[in-house]
């Protein structure tokens, strides 16, 4: 059955949203404001999934996708939408999530942070599959909503130097001893080097090593090898062990890293994000600052150039060791401290043990920082950071954590905005600023939170006894 629908909005999977007979329809390929005919492909009790058959009235924001693989490849979802409109949808999603999850509205919306629209992805994981029906070896991202590997010949979100490697990599893998036992190639670009990490499930032969070296010489790349877990990653050539680094020119910093370390995908946006975060924190020379989930010290080292001391805490000792080395190399050893700790299990006693911080930066993974913000919310007015900047890659956990800080801890959500870290995708990176309110407001929020917790405990006890 073909229906005619008016598309009202867009979700973060780039599906148009419409309503019919009290039911939500998610329409693949449709944009807000468009009138389309659709074919339903899946029916559920509360919603349907459909695909566009014909666009009767196109959106003024619709653009021609640059990539010939768009719609099949799962690497991008929004190439058919103008970049500014993509960011507007992400901003709306952030604001909606704050309200629906936390009943919060930022006092101020920060202007979006923009960067390169194409060629921005300096880190990627490419899958490798042998598919005889498609001509042999495929190297690329997965197909949209599928475990199959897309038949990619180019990629416009990868830097051109990497996009040009997709077809040569196919031929190289095909020439090796066990192409079907090499499932993955990770790509990591520094400011001066391209590193490829080959995952191989069988030992490489001398012939395989020769093939890798010939490819590296021809294409100007460096090979690292991974036979098992992350601890087995090592450079094919020993002299390449310290090849990767990115820079933060505003702060005079060079940050070395290994190809499997976590670094931001988009180097240009990362520089802008660090700059904005420090401006929002407004660190003073006498301030002591904490950087939680600090990784390689992406924020810690810039903070140390401005404050009295920066303390970075991270769950990976390998990362904190590299952060410490980078700090020492830049003469910041006496103004930085690093600790290795699982920040998903901390409590208020641990937080107090770190001492007083004037400012705090929190940059967690997608799981958010629930344990950290619960501990923060229990701190007395005189022992808590006055200002906190929270960098997030998941609006849902940011909104959850913000609700704890505001409703239970007496913080105010002063501002928030999106960072366009991943153009053409539904990923939403954002930044939010919290400030501690006056003592009376903090104590009132904490008292109300304790009362609510008591009432919930009593309710659960009554339910268990019934």
Swiss-Prot record:
The active site is at residue 393. [4Fe-4S] cluster binds at residues 67, 73, 76, 155. Keywords: 4Fe-4S, Iron, Iron-sulfur, Metal-binding, Methyltransferase, rRNA processing, S-adenosyl-L-methionine, Transferase. Its EC number is 2.1.1.190. CDD domains: AdoMet_MTases. Disulfide bonds: none annotated. One of its GO terms (molecular function) is 4 iron, 4 sulfur cluster binding. The keyword Metal-binding applies. It catalyses: uridine(1939) in 23S rRNA + S-adenosyl-L-methionine = 5-methyluridine(1939) in 23S rRNA + S-adenosyl-L-homocysteine + H(+). Residues 1-54 form the TRAM domain. S-adenosyl-L-methionine binds at residues 264, 293, 298, 314, 342, 363. It is an enzyme of class 2 (transferase). One of its GO terms (biological process) is rRNA base methylation. The keyword Transferase applies. NCBIfam families: PRK13168.1 (NF009639), rumA (TIGR00479). Catalyzes the formation of 5-methyl-uridine at position 1939 (m5U1939) in 23S rRNA. Belongs to the class I-like SAM-binding methyltransferase superfamily. RNA M5U methyltransferase family. RlmD subfamily. PANTHER family: 23S RRNA (URACIL(1939)-C(5))-METHYLTRANSFERASE RLMD (PTHR11061:SF49), RNA M5U METHYLTRANSFERASE (PTHR11061). This is 23S rRNA (uracil(1939)-C(5))-methyltransferase RlmD. It comes from Bordetella parapertussis (strain 12822 / ATCC BAA-587 / NCTC 13253).
């Amino acid at each position: 059955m073909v229906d005619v629908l008016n598309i009202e909005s867009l979700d973060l999977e780039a599906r148009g949203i419409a309503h019919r007979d009290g039911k939500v329809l998610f329409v693949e390929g449709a944009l807000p404001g468009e009138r389309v005919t659709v074919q339903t492909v899946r029916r559920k009790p509360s919603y349907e999934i459909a695909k566009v058959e014909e666009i009767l009235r196109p959106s003024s924001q619709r653009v021609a996708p640059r990539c010939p693989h768009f719609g099949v490849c799962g690497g991008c979802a929004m190439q058919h939408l103008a970049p500014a409109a993509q960011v507007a949808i992400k901003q709306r999603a952030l604001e909606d999530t704050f309200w629906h999850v936390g009943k919060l509205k930022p006092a101020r919306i920060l202007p979006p942070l923009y960067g390169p629209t194409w060629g921005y992805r300096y880190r990627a994981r490419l899958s490798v599959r042998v598919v005889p029906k498609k001509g042999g070896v495929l190297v690329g991202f997965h197909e949209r909503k599928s475990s199959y590997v897309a038949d990619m010949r180019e990629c416009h979100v990868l830097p051109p130097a990497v996009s040009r490697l997709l077809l040569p990599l196919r031929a190289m893998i095909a020439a090796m001893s066990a192409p079907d036992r090499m499932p993955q190639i990770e790509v990591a670009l520094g400011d001066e080097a391209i590193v490829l990490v080959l995952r191989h499930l069988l030992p490489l032969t001398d012939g395989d090593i020769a093939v890798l070296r010939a490819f590296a010489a021809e294409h100007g790349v460096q090979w690292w090898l991974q036979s098992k877990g992350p601890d087995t990653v090592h450079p094919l050539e020993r002299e390449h062990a310290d090849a990767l680094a990115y820079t933060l020119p505003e702060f005079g910093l060079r940050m070395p890293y290994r190809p499997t370390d976590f670094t931001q995908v988009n180097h240009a946006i990362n520089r802008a994000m660090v700059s904005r975060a420090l401006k929002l924190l407004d660190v003073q020379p006498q301030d002591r600052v904490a950087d939680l989930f600090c990784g390689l010290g992406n924020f810690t080292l810039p903070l140390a150039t401005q404050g009295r001391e920066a303390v970075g805490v991270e769950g990976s000792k390998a990362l904190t060791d590299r952060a410490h080395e980078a700090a020492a190399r830049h003469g910041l050893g006496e103004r930085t401290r690093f600790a290795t700790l699982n920040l998903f299990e901390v409590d208020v006693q641990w937080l107090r043990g770190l001492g007083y911080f004037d400012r705090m930066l929190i940059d967690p993974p997608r799981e958010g920082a629930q344990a950290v913000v619960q501990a923060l919310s229990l701190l007395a007015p005189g022992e808590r950071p006055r200002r906190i900047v929270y960098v997030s890659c998941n609006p849902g956990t940011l909104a959850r954590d913000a609700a704890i800080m505001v409703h239970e801890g007496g913080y105010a959500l002063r501002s928030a905005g999106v960072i366009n870290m991943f153009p053409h995708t539904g990923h939403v990176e954002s930044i939010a600023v919290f400030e501690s309110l006056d003592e009376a407001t903090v104590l009132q929020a904490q008292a109300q939170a304790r009362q609510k917790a008591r009432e919930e405990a009593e309710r659960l006890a009554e339910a268990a006894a019934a």
